[in-house]
Amino acid sequence: MNYEKKVLLCPDSQEGIFTSVYEGWSWAVKGIDVAILIKEPENLELFCSYINISPDLEKAQKVAGTIRKRLGWYVYETLCYVAASGYEEKGTIILQVLVQALGKGGCGRQIMDKLTDPYVNLALKLRTRVWHELHRYYG
């Protein structure tokens, strides 16, 4: 079995990140380490496959629809705020939150209550930062 880490490189957009989530889902639920980055790292890692992902509206809409339907609007809004943040590993955060919520033995709509989980905690912090920045911009 191949346990090589997969690094998905995508554009810095919600559509690009959600397409990468769609592509990386099958590896992530099998326990393979998957990272989603918005730009190529300066130092490449050994034993990693770097895969460029092109945005696909249909795949991104499927991911968004699944989040809204199975996890609710609060989780969807939170993940959209994370996608709008300037954090470089925001794609990985979104993927890991979804794997924990929808994967085998997932907690579903209560995922945002798992504050001790580092990915959920960081997602909520990024949501707050982006929300404050947005409301500071609009006055």
Where do the language-model regions lie?
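A basic- and aromatic-enriched beta-loop-alpha substructure that forms the phosphate/nucleotide-
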Residues: 56-112
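Alpha-helical context
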Residues: 1-2, 39, 43, 74, ...
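Internal, well-folded beta-alpha domain core
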Residues: 103-139
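Phosphate-binding glycine-rich loops and adjacent basic patches that engage nucleotide phosphates
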Residues: 24-25, 84, 88, 121, ...
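Intrinsically disordered or highly flexible coil/loop and linker segments, enriched in small
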Residues: 31, 73-76, 132
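N-terminal ordered "arm"
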Residues: 2-55
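Generic preference for well-ordered secondary structure
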Residues: 2-6, 47, 51, 78, ...
